[in-house]
A protein has these predicted regions:
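Intrinsically disordered, metal-sensing/regulatory segments
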Residues: 1-258
């Protein structure tokens, strides 16, 4: 039950953020959107390091000087996995006019939702891996550390939910449809978490690889999508400052509560 509630927390964050479209009249300003994206990127980088890569290396400590190997391999598989999805799935990033991936007749709205869904996959996997480790009795992963990651992902999902629902509204969608689009973009997280838990419980020795896999996938999203988004438009340091704020928040949560 504890794990079930934990994997739902990030989805609730997305839903809360998407609900902004129901009470806000105007679309997000460019500066506000860059600030929100910067914050989300900071949280994801900190989570990748403190909650995923470091535990992956600690779990491999019996390997001695080769303790880095599972984290190294898993990290690169995660990067290549997202790179493959990036080329195989048609999607359109918020604020961009150029679609990515194979040519398609899908509408702008659908491709915008697919873009956010694409980068929610590693977040769901990250939460799933943490809870799989906790359920398996891993010494490095506690209920508190798994909950901290869920809370961190949920916090950064709030601005992400708004970032997808508000542009959908600006594209001409009704408030209800824009809200639904924001919510649907996050539904992949609990699904990914459950599937990862089911897979990880069958291959517990692979947990260091799975943890670093999720980290690699998340960092790919940050560099490929979020950093360019927070740098769009006139020069401003707001995205960078909020990146540092997001990183600090997640680091404090992980160290103080995990």
């Amino acid at each position: 039950m504890e794990a079930f509630l934990g994997i739902l927390i990030p989805f609730l964050g997305t839903t809360l953020g998407a609900a902004c479209v129901l009470c806000m009249k105007k679309s997000l300003g460019n500066l506000v959107q860059r600030a929100l994206v910067g914050f989300a990127a900071g949280v994801m980088v900190a989570a990748s390091i403190w909650s995923l890569l470091i535990p992956a290396i600690e779990q491999s400590a019996p390997m001695g000087r080769m303790a880095f190997f599972p984290a190294f391999v898993g990290f690169w598989i995660g990067v290549l996995f997202l790179l493959a999805l990036d080329h195989l799935i048609p999607h359109l990033h918020v604020g961009s006019e150029q679609a990515e991936g194979p040519k398609t007749k899908l509408g702008r709205t659908t491709m915008m939702v697919l873009a956010v869904t694409l980068h929610n996959i590693p977040e769901g996997m990250a939460v799933g891996v943490m809870y799989a480790g906790f359920l398996a009795g891993s010494e490095q992963i506690t209920a508190a550390s798994a909950l901290v990651l869920s809370l961190g992902i949920a916090i950064q999902n709030i601005p992400e939910g708004a970032i997808i629902s508000m542009p959908l509204r600006a594209e001409g969608q009704s408030r209800g449809k824009a809200f639904a689009g924001g919510v649907l973009s996050g539904i992949v997280e609990p699904i990914g978490a459950v599937l990862t838990i089911l897979a990880a419980r069958l291959i517990i020795p692979a947990l260091p690889y799975l943890l670093s896999f999720a980290a690699g996938a998340m960092l790919y999203v940050v560099v490929e999508e979020l950093i360019p988004e927070m740098s769009q438009g006139r020069h401003s340091n707001v995205g960078t400052v909020l990146f540092a704020v997001g990183f600090s928040v997640m680091m404090v949560l992980d160290v103080a509560l995990g």
